[in-house]
């Protein structure tokens, strides 16, 4: 009996020892050497000491390894603007020691090719005879491994960890591991602009990040475990792949412990043991766990996750002895489709998403820790978002875990934008590679409840529709835990008939370049949306892309791998054009317009029936493709000054009050009519909601104009009612707003309004007699009927020169007349994406910066930025270029040029010319003033100011310089390349 007890104790200690140390951390200093000539394998570098060292985890750029960046550096990514390489103005940035690129962030070091990493590791004695795996969480991107001089194999996933079974290669005691990482694009070409590899965002780096470990298991182990929740019967089907390489059948069991700890809903746990016999080889074991009706469900409002511990056990002398353990997370949730909408646990939801582009300048790669991703998702949630699409890449495990915790619906993608030199469906190696990557993604991340949607990549070319159709069909039949689309595409791409849902452009944007702003229209009747079947949700692809001027204060934040030397160039250009001090003002003014556009595009989507959601491009800035500053946060997800999350939340959250207004400008005798709606996608209907409508003015007057009590269902376009407000006597120009709120909640929204008085034609100097000009001192002018008005003309004619010479006042209304500035095409809407990537496609401006403290604007209420009342004056209006004006000169209404050129341009200025005073504008303040309320008021404001004692222009400008505005022509912009992005090509895939 004593011998038996000793034997049993020894056996149990042996089993316990298997779990004492199950992994060895390989982080630390590794030997390192660049293999520039690709000779390392033939020269057996895996078997010798390397000549440098580098810490892992880490990347070569992060550790300042590689080549200095020069003008000859070959980047991974498309360029459609070659001015940097040919323009004399860019020559100083091509000089070694001062290398700066305008197209994307600039790393200190760059290297593409193989590099070697080597180290020794000592195995514990109790690892002898066990299965041992080398785990590399995120190499970039092809890894080849040697152990003790013997080649183990190669892996090249861009999405999941590389795991090498090194059992046959290790020995007792010291072992040598050599890893060759190669980041070249070879036979497998994801596309140079794929965010998995491109220098446009993260950079095509060489290295290994995340966890680096040797992991030990027994020879009976869990190779895969997938959990499939079913809400109909509150069960979870667990598919466990058990591998038995022990050489004999093993009788035992699988022990399951699932536990959810919810702060709001308590704790729920399930413990079940299922008995099995594990024959030699690989087997899939399917067990069903009864979670019960006490199951705690997961969604964006209650992101409660179950932690499942699964242990494979062997029956030993009547007891279960643990052999291998797997810990995973899953959510009791179902993400499905109901008609045109997505459903979470049977309740409709609307995706309010952003596109994440692997843009992390400090490291140059996606964060590998959960805390960093949790910060990103919580910031996005503070802006009312609930969804993220990962553009042509798949994030690491930490991102899914953080999204599970925060409650975010994710669409990771295969690591490919198979275009611009690559293709899909043409029989190239990328076809099989992406198919395998999807399998790997589902295996690695499939249990995460946040993994709700999947696509293979972005905007392919080739015979891709047939390929993605097979892809979607396969996954629909294979794994119903999420929904599938083939690829996320622009409006010009072919339709994907087999996709369960569609991420496609076409039904997006604002048409304010063609008609005046309103909040009436929506995307009903859109031809793109009409293509989708009755059970196929439609999500807008890359919504927004409205630009904002760079924030040069941001430059100091780039303390890591990638530096904002593009911003330094843009700052220099602004300074060279005599506007160094205006950078922050331009950022703020253009940002206000950007936020206005995002608000109205999002609301337009919310006003559209059967619209499943939108994906912004993006909440944060995009640092590449010419520097696409499209975010209301910087690239680091820090808020910009012109709008904060609370303000954004008014028009972008689960419950948004909406008002359909045909216009935003009113005058005496008009009637303000508004249809009130609610888009509500909260966790439950709102019963007996008190909905209040206020009309507010800038003078703190607040009048209730509507009150409704309604039960608000979950869904879009819920009609609340209408309000109608007669606009009585308007005595002065005034700004106001319409406010709609749901009492007792934080759901409130507002729309800007402008009220202008009726203006008598006599005050506008519309007749020839009135516009002849007042008598200047010493002149022979005798017109005494209208002595107050300046001389009004549309050019600097001889009479204007004579009046100015004699000390008189002149107003030039030069709409459509100037040539110097004609090269700049202005619209009310700002630059889309950026002018470099789209080869100077108009518009070229990002709004206006107004000297709103100037006395002229006493009669024309305005902020320092453009708002919807400016549309009538600004849209398609010519600008004047002030390059030749005196240093320090600034117009009263300054158009904000594309930051690649930053010409000093504008639409309204004053100056002393000769002995007189000149006011000149290219805004149309002449035509159809009986219908153009804003233009009429602007004309009156200008005239009133010119006739006031405050008309004292600061700068003196030669008459010849003013005359040049009508004769001089600026040189055309040469991009020095014939290539163009897909959207500018006549035929799109």
Q: Where do the PLM segments sit?
A:
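Accessory beta-strand-rich segments of carbohydrate-active enzymes
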Residues: 33-37, 66-67, 77, 83-97, ...
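Substrate-binding/catalytic cleft of secreted carbohydrate-active enzymes
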Residues: 377-378, 387-633
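Extended acidic/polar, glycine-enriched regions
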Residues: 170-174, 241-336, 729-761
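Catalytic beta-strand/loop cores that center a nucleophilic Ser/Cys/Thr
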Residues: 819, 836-933, 950-989
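Accessory carbohydrate-binding/adhesion or oligomerization-edge regions at the termini
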Residues: 20-98, 180, 184-186, 942, ...
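N-terminal carbohydrate-binding accessory modules
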Residues: 309-380
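Beta-strand-rich binding/interaction modules
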Residues: 145-147, 235-277, 285-287, 670-711, ...
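Short alpha-beta junction capping motif
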Residues: 787-834, 915, 921, 942, ...
């Amino acid at each position: 009996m004593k011998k038996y007890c000793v034997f049993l104790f020894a056996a149990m200690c042996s089993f316990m020892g298997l779990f004492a140390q199950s992994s060895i951390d390989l982080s630390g200093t590794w030997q390192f050497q660049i293999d520039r000539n690709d000779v390392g394998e033939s020269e057996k570098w895996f078997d010798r000491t390397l000549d440098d060292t580098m810490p892992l985890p880490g990347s070569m750029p992060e550790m300042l390894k590689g080549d200095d960046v020069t003008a000859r550096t070959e980047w991974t990514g498309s360029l459609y603007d070659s001015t940097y390489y040919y323009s004399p103005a860019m020559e100083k940035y091509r000089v070694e020691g001062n290398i700066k690129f305008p197209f994307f962030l600039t790393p200190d070091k760059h290297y593409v090719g193989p590099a070697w990493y080597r180290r020794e590791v000592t195995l514990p004695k109790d690892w002898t005879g066990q299965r041992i795996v080398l785990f590399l969480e995120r190499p970039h991107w092809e890894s080849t491994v040697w152990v003790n001089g013997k080649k183990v194999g190669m892996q090249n996933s861009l999405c999941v960890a590389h795991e090498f079974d090194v059992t046959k290669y290790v020995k007792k005691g010291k072992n040598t591991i050599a890893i060759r990482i190669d980041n070249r694009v070879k036979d497998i070409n994801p596309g140079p602009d794929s965010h998995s590899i491109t220098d446009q965002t993260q950079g095509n780096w060489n290295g290994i990040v995340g966890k680096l470990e040797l992991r030990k298991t027994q020879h009976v182990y869990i190779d895969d475990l997938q959990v499939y929740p079913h809400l109909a019967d509150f069960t979870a089907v667990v598919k466990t792949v058990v591998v038995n390489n022990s050489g004999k059948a093993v009788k035992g069991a699988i022990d399951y412990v699932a536990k959810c700890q919810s702060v709001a809903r308590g704790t729920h746990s399930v413990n079940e043991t299922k008995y099995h016999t594990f024959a030699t080889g690989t087997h899939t074991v399917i067990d069903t766990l009864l979670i019960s009706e006490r199951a705690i469900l997961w969604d964006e409002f209650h992101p409660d996750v179950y932690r499942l511990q699964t242990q494979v056990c062997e029956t030993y002398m009547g007891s279960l002895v643990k052999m291998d353990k797997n810990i995973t997370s899953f959510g009791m949730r179902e993400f499905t489709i109901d008609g045109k909408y997505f459903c979470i646990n049977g309740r409709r939801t609307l995706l309010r998403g952003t596109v994440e582009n692997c843009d992390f300048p400090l490291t140059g790669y996606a964060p590998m820790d959960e805390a960093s991703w949790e910060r990103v998702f919580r910031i996005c949630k503070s802006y009312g978002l609930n969804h993220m699409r990962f553009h042509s890449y798949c994030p690491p495990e930490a991102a899914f875990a953080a999204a599970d915790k925060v409650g975010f619906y994710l669409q990771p993608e295969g690591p490919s934008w198979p275009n611009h030199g690559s293709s899909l469906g043409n029989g190239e190696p990328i076809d099989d590679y992406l198919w395998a990557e999807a399998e790997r993604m589902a295996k690695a991340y499939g249990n995460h409840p946040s993994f709700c949607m999947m696509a293979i990549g972005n905007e392919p070319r080739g015979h891709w529709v047939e390929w993605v159709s097979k892809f979607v069909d396969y996954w629909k039949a294979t794994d119903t835990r999420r929904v599938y689309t083939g690829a996320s595409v622009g409006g010009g791409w072919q339709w994907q008939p087999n996709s369960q849902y569609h991420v496609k452009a076409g039904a997006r944007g604002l048409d304010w370049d063609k008609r005046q702003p309103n909040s009436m229209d929506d995307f009903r009747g859109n031809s793109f949306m009409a293509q989708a079947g009755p059970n196929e949700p439609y999500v807008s692809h890359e919504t927004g892309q409205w630009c904002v001027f760079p924030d040069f204060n941001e430059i100091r934040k780039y303390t890591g791998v990638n530096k904002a030397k593009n911003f330094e160039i843009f700052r220099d250009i602004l300074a060279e054009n005599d506007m160094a001090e205006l950078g922050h003002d331009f950022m703020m003014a253009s940002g206000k317009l950007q936020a206005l556009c995002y608000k109205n595009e999002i609301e337009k989507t919310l006003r559209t029936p059967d619209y499943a959601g939108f994906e912004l491009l993006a909440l944060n800035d995009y640092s590449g493709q010419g520097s696409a500053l499209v975010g209301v946060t910087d690239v680091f997800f820090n808020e910009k000054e012109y709008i904060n999350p609370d303000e954004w939340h008014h028009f972008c959250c689960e419950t948004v009050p909406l008002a359909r207004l045909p216009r935003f400008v009113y005058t005496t005798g008009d009637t303000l009519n508004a249809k009130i709606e609610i888009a509500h996608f909260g966790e439950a209907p709102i019963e007996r909601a008190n909905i209040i409508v206020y009309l507010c003015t800038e003078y703190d007057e607040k009048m209730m104009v509507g009150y409704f009590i309604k039960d608000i269902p979950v869904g879009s376009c819920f009609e609340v009612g209408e309000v109608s407000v007669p606009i009585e006597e308007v005595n002065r120009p005034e700004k106001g707003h319409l406010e709609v709120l749901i009492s007792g909640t934080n759901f409130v929204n507002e729309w800007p309004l402008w009220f202008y008085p009726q203006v008598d034609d006599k005050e506008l100097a519309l007749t020839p007699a009135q516009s002849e000009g007042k008598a200047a001192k010493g002149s022979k002018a005798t017109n005494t009927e209208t002595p107050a008005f300046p001389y009004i003309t549309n050019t600097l004619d001889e009479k204007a020169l004579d009046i100015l010479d004699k000390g008189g006042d002149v107003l030039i209304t030069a709409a459509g007349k100037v040539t110097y500035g004609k090269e700049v095409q202005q619209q009310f809407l700002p630059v889309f994406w950026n002018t470099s990537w789209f080869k100077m496609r108009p518009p070229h401006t990002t709004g206006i910066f107004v000297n709103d403290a100037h006395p002229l604007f006493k009669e024309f209420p305005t902020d320092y930025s453009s708002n919807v009342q400016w549309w009538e004056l600004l849209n398609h209006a010519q600008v004047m270029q002030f390059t030749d004006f005196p240093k320090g000169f600034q117009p009263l209404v300054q158009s904000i040029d594309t930051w690649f050129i930053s010409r000093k341009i504008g639409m309204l200025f004053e100056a002393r010319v000769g002995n007189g005073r000149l006011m000149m504008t290219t805004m149309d303040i002449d035509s159809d003033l009986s219908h153009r309320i804003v233009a009429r008021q602007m004309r009156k404001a200008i005239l009133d100011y010119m006739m006031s004692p405050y008309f004292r222009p600061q700068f003196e400008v030669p008459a010849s310089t003013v005359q040049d505005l009508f004769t001089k022509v600026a040189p055309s912009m040469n991009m020095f390349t014939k290539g163009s992005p897909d959207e500018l090509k006549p035929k799109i895939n």
